[in-house]
From Swiss-Prot:
Keywords: Cytoplasm, Cytoplasmic vesicle, ER-Golgi transport, Golgi apparatus, Membrane, Protein transport, Repeat, Transport. One of its GO terms (cellular component) is Golgi membrane. SUPFAM superfamilies: ARM repeat, Clathrin adaptor appendage domain, Subdomain of clathrin and coatomer appendage domain. Transmembrane segments: none annotated. The coatomer is a cytosolic protein complex that binds to dilysine motifs and reversibly associates with Golgi non-clathrin-coated vesicles, which further mediate biosynthetic protein transport from the ER, via the Golgi up to the trans Golgi network. Coatomer complex is required for budding from Golgi membranes, and is essential for the retrograde Golgi-to-ER transport of dilysine-tagged proteins. It is found in: Cytoplasm; Golgi apparatus membrane; Cytoplasmic vesicle, COPI-coated vesicle membrane. Belongs to the COPG family. This is Coatomer subunit gamma-2. One of its GO terms (biological process) is intracellular protein transport. GO terms for molecular function: structural molecule activity. PANTHER family: COATOMER SUBUNIT GAMMA, COATOMER SUBUNIT GAMMA-2. Disulfide bonds: none annotated.
Length: 872
């Protein structure tokens, strides 16, 4: 009697998998049945299925046992059962890499490949190419050429796809089959034409001219396969992105013409390609949007989903271009497919007017509980974007988000909501109290440690600045009583910030910290003891240094420096200035609502600058330069499409700059050796040493370094322009083999000029409490001057220009200029080369142009002078 499974069993998978408890040893024992005569096709099929199942589940087969099973399986070629033979082909492909002497089946596969049974020929080709290596390929070359142009479409497709895989083993041999591939590309069969185009592109993709010619040929002659058209559109859009012609190119005209194709998949591919092209204007997007608008009313759910998802992407950059589709999108709100309805609403949230927000929020609340967490995150992202667009609607959004926060959901969903509320609080000061209240309510019953610590950190930063900070103390101390160690430690830090900034609350906070000093966890006790003693001193300087600002160094770098210090005992105390600064301030990281893996990294990963520090320290000439202060973003020194690609990264040390030149040779008939970049400075900078890249083979990047000493006599000379010339020895080589000539000749290539500016000497560091930091530094080295920015037309432009020029970190969200204001104060903080803290207060007034009063405070006189001289 067959057991009947109910629906729950079916969903959970109970009883639905007959191979669930297979054991490898038992299956290999069964494989001996292959040697029996006569062959039992039905039983052998079942055993082969078990072997394939185990292989695909990741079961490890030893070489000996795999080879034994493989040899037993080869006897099955004696059977004429079609299903068994095709299962043998599949098993050969799966066991090719784990068995020895698999080439024993070559003759059997070649026989099937050239036989009269069409049903065997295609699978035999695929299996044969799986076991063939570069030395055997020429032996089957004649058969492969014949198979590519075979009249049977399954045989031709198998040969084309196998050829594509064989290019990884022997590109040069497969390239000789290009004429056959071109013949196959004119086939009437849609799959053969698609696979032929794929092979042709793969053989020519490194030759831009050849790809362009291929595109021209097929765009003029036309194609019968919609799949091939889709591939052609993708190739064209890739070329278009690299081209300087942009949207005036014939390639763009071709993609646009595909919007009128009779196949829906081609129309969608063309629309998607246009939308994803960089720098597209609303006018150029219009035809693609019109097509997607038609798809919104399609009876096919897949088309409706594709259309609304793509329109959702367009709405992020060009909301006005999608406004014409609003009526169609509103019709999709009631779509039976919840994914389509969600995307329709989130698109409308991006394109709708301020007056439609309330209605849309009401509609989405009716079914938000029914959709998956993934789509709930999409809704939250749309709300976040809407808050930035219509700040006055923050109360509606906040209420909606708080309701979502109470619903059940996973970590990613909850994190997206928390991040969205935090971004609303940061963008709209009016929403701060209601936002903090919702977050306080959430942490009362929050199972995610990461979110609880994040919210406590926010409460410590923003809570003390609210009109009634005392109301948050209860929520924070509850965490100390009820939560795990990590959350308790975060709560202690938050309490300390309230005590440091609010004199009336200090006695209460000290009492609470004393209670925390009895905690069972070391970290919590240590924090409580440390903060209690700092707060007891009642000194602003101590509060600023140890409670407000915290560490500004790279934690990974500090760990390494401390380890090094313990290995080499010294009487000198450990100097924090030897530790590289953190390149990304901890509090500056922008809220990212894109889903990421919930698993947190177990080990601390070194950041970009820590990696550069290790790389440079390994070069003897740079070993004694001191700690790496800052590494710039890459600067491109050559145009795209030139013979050589060169970009530069500036590594700034206390008294030197190391210029790292990443060089790539794009000529396949040249090998470059002894590559250096000669630099001629315009100021008092001195070039000390060159470290050449030993060789640059075709398309393999190499690194050359130039070491420059900063001027000692004039510390304000921070800006300099270098003329750069790449010098090298050229050895011509054969493009096919890459073998170079014995002798070479010297040559050079002029690069773009390279500038060192003030921002290269300053590292961004965020000061969470700018006022306290300003008072702590004091006015010993304070400088002040007033400037007129006559060409600047708005306060926003002035703020952006100042931040970019100085390379400093905006504090107190002062980079955001309030609407309809004629004056503004910009607060900036950073660390000047050598480890000196520097703060800038810039008062801006808008009249005829912008008047700017700059006040600089620093721990040393040099940074203050440098900034005012550079600005002037």
């Amino acid at each position: 009697m067959i057991k009947k499974f109910d629906k729950k069993d079916e969903e959970s998978g109970i009883g639905s998998n007959p191979f669930q408890h297979l054991e490898k040893s038992a299956v290999l024992q069964e494989a001996r049945l292959f040697n029996e005569t006569p062959i039992n096709p039905r039983r052998c099929l079942h055993i082969l299925t078990k072997i394939l199942y185990l292989l695909n589940q990741g079961e490890h087969f030893g070489t000996m046992e795999a080879t034994e099973a493989f040899f037993a399986m080869t006897r099955l070629f004696q059977s004429n059962d079609q299903t068994l033979r095709r299962m043998c082909y599949l098993t050969i492909k799966e066991m090719a890499n784990i068995s020895e002497d698999v080439i024993i089946v070559t003759s059997s596969l070649t026989k099937d490949m050239t036989g009269k049974e069409d049903v065997y020929r295609g699978p035999a080709i695929r299996a044969l190419c799986r076991i063939t290596d570069a030395t055997m390929l020429q032996g089957i070359e004649r058969y492969m050429k014949q198979a590519i142009v075979d009249k049977v479409s399954s045989v031709s497709s198998s040969a084309l796809v196998s050829s594509l895989h064989m290019t990884k083993i022997s590109y040069d041999v497969v390239k000789r089959w290009i004429n056959e591939a071109q013949e196959a590309a004119s086939s009437d069969n849609i799959m053969v034409q698609y696979h032929a185009l794929g092979l042709l592109y793969n053989l020519r993709k490194n030759d831009r001219l050849a790809v362009s010619k291929m595109l021209n040929k097929f765009t003029k002659s036309g194609l019968k396969s919609p799949f091939a058209y889709c591939m052609l559109i993708r190739i064209a859009s890739r070329l278009l992105e690299e081209s300087e012609e942009g949207h005036n190119s014939p390639l763009f005209d071709f993609i646009e013409s595909c919007l009128r194709n009779k196949h829906e998949m081609v129309i969608y591919e063309a629309a998607s390609a246009i939308i994803h092209l960089p720098n597209c204007t609303a006018r150029e997007l219009a035809p693609a949007v019109s097509v997607l608008q038609l798809f919104c009313s399609s009876p096919k759910p897949a088309l409706r989903y594709a259309a609304v998802r793509t329109l959702n992407k367009v709405a992020m950059k060009h909301p006005s271009a999608v406004t014409a589709c609003n009526l169609d999108l509103e019709n999709l709100i009631t779509d039976s497919n919840r994914s389509i309805a969600t995307l329709a609403i989130t698109t409308l949230l991006k394109t709708g007017s301020e007056s439609s927000v309330d209605r849309l929020m009401k509609q989405i609340s009716t079914f938000v509980s029914e959709i998956s967490d993934e789509f709930k995150v999409v809704v939250v992202q749309a709300i976040s974007a809407l808050c930035q667009k219509y700040p006055r609607k923050h109360s509606v959004m906040m209420t909606f988000l708080s309701n979502m926060l109470r619903d059940d959901g996973g970590f990613e969903y909850k994190r997206a909501i928390v991040d969205c509320i935090i971004s609303i609080i940061e963008e709209n000061p009016d929403s701060k109290e209601s936002g903090l209240a919702h977050l306080c309510e959430f942490i009362e019953d929050c199972e995610h440690t990461v979110l609880a610590t994040k919210i406590l950190h926010l409460l410590g930063r923003e809570g003390p600045k609210t009109p009634t900070p005392s109301k948050y103390i209860r929520f924070i101390f509850n965490r100390v009583v009820l939560e795990n160690e990590a959350v308790r430690a975060a709560a202690v830090s938050a309490l300390a910030k309230f005590g440091a900034q609010n004199e009336p609350l200090l006695p209460s906070v000290l009492v609470l910290l004393q209670r925390c000093m009895m905690d069972s966890d070391d970290e919590v006790r240590d924090r409580a003891t440390f903060y209690f003693n700092v707060l007891n001193q009642n000194q602003l300087a101590l509060n600023t240094a140890y409670i407000f600002n915290g560490l500004t160094v790279s934690v990974f770098g500090m760990e390494k420096a401390l380890h090094q210090y313990t290995l080499e005992p010294s009487e000198k105390p450990f100097d924090m200035k030897t530790v590289p600064l953190a390149t990304v301030p901890f509090l500056e990281q922008k809220t990212d609502l894109a889903p990421i893996a919930t698993k947190q990294p177990e080990k601390m990963v070194p950041v970009r600058q820590d990696i550069f520090q290790d790389q440079l320290a390994a070069i003897p000439e740079f070993k004694n330069l001191g700690p790496l202060f800052k590494s710039s973003e890459p600067v491109q020194l050559t145009e795209a499409e030139t013979e050589y690609f060169v970009r530069c990264i500036k590594h700034v040390f206390p008294n030197h700059i190391v210029f790292q030149f990443d060089c790539t040779n794009t000529l396949n008939d040249q090998l470059l050796e002894k590559v250096t970049v000669q630099m001629e400075p315009s100021e008092a900078y001195e070039v000390v040493h060159y470290v050449p890249a030993p060789s640059l083979p075709y398309n393999q990047p190499g690194i050359s370094y130039t070491l420059v000493r900063l001027p000692d006599d004039d510390p304000t000379a921070v800006s300099c322009t270098f003329s750069c010339t790449m010098k090298f020895v050229v050895r011509d080589c054969d493009p096919q083999t890459g073998v170079p000539d014995d002798e070479g000749y010297s040559d050079e290539y002029v690069l773009e000029d390279l500038e060192v500016t003030l921002s290269d000497h300053i590292q961004k560091i965020l000061k969470p409490n700018f006022g306290a930091a300003w008072e702590e530094i004091g006015d010993t080295y304070e400088k002040e001057e007033t400037f007129a920015l006559t060409t600047t037309k708005s306060l926003e432009e002035a703020v952006n220009n100042i931040i970019k020029f100085l390379g400093m970190q905006p504090c107190e969200r002062s980079d955001k200029v309030p609407e309809n204001k004629n004056s503004h104060v910009l607060y900036l903080s950073g660390v000047y080369r050598g480890g000196h803290d520097v703060l800038v207060r810039s008062r801006l007034a808008l009249a005829d142009g912008v008047t700017m009063q700059v006040t600089v405070r620093s721990q040393d006189e040099t940074p203050a002078n440098v900034i005012l001289v550079s600005v002037g």
